[in-house]
């Protein structure tokens, strides 16, 4: 599966315990997303476009209205990064 560098960064953050929170307007439409690391810091390169690509590829999912987390398919698709030794 082809995954861009930006998507890999987001997947790696999610694999390390991060989450993606979504914000809806009063009509129930998605207006904003924010990716958080496990320490609570925001990830700036997680855009709406990246979120939609990861969701369409079923690499992330949300259950019961909770924040989006990485799926088992996403965990196997994420490549290891050298800075996490």
From Swiss-Prot:
Segments traversing the membrane: none
InterPro entries according to UniProt: YjhX_toxin
Pfam family, one: YjhX_toxin
Disulfide partners: none
Coiled coil: none
Family to which the UniProt record says this protein belongs: Belongs to the UPF0386 family.
Name of the protein in question: UPF0386 protein VF_0869
Naturally occurring in which organism (per UniProt): Aliivibrio fischeri (strain ATCC 700601 / ES114)
Lineage: Bacteria, Pseudomonadati, Pseudomonadota, Gammaproteobacteria, Vibrionales
